[in-house]
Amino acid sequence: MRLRLFLAASALALLSGCAGLTSHEALEGQGDAQTWKTHKQQLSELDAWQIDGKVGIRAPRDSGSGTLFWLQRQGYYDIRLSGPLGRGAARLTGREGAVSLEVAGQGRYQAESPEALLEEQLGWRLPVSHLLWWVRGLPAPDSKSRLTLDADSRLARLEQDGWQIEYTRYAEQNGYWLPERLKLHGQDLDVTLVIKDWQPRQLGR
């Protein structure tokens, strides 16, 4: 009888542990959960920024590097790439439901999502909607994720929707600890972002 009770209790404990892993966020690593929660709340309120940096892209058919400019104003974004993959300049602008892509020497294209545009015109399967969160060092809130925290309770590694993101360097800007270098690995695309200048702002208050 005692053995049965022990086995039943062990099974319940195992199931409880598995249930925890299927929640929206599964936390691992050295960091403190409460400190991460506070850090996450602060960054979630950040709804505007300007980024200048470099981007490296490796895809099955081509690869290269270029410069990155990213202007975010709440739901509106303006992302510009110059020089990657020998394509010249590309500019992605839009908000939810209305997105435009301009490619130098090719023209202007429109779609309802940035993911559809980039895959159709450039062949890149890149979750831009998630990038709005990942670039701040946060998981996207609408799907499950596995988080590994560093000793400072910031993201060291993120796994979400088939992507792995590694955060190797942070810097403090205007009271926010923000990623300076991150590597994104997808099924057929690798992206490295090196951010030279972060200008974070809050517009929603």
Curated annotation (Swiss-Prot):
Keyword set, alphabetical order: Cell outer membrane, Chaperone, Lipoprotein, Membrane, Palmitate, Protein transport, Signal, Transport
Membrane topology: Lipid-anchor
GO CC annotations, alphabetized: cell outer membrane
Single GO BP term: protein localization to outer membrane
InterPro entries: LolA/LolB/LppX (IPR029046), OM_lipoprot_LolB (IPR004565)
Principal place of residence: membrane
Subcellular localization, as worded in the UniProt entry: Cell outer membrane
Covalent lipid adducts (N-palmitoyl cysteine), residues: C18
Signal sequence bounds: 1-17
Lipidation (S-diacylglycerol cysteine): C18
Gene3D superfamilies: Lipoprotein localisation LolA/LolB/LppX (2.50.20.10)
Family: Belongs to the LolB family.
Function: Plays a critical role in the incorporation of lipoproteins in the outer membrane after they are released by the LolA protein.
Oligomeric and partner information: Monomer.
Name used for this protein in its record: Outer-membrane lipoprotein LolB
UniProt organism field: Pseudomonas aeruginosa (strain ATCC 15692 / DSM 22644 / CIP 104116 / JCM 14847 / LMG 12228 / 1C / PRS 101 / PAO1)
Lineage, uppermost ranks: Bacteria, Pseudomonadati, Pseudomonadota, Gammaproteobacteria, Pseudomonadales
Gene: lolB
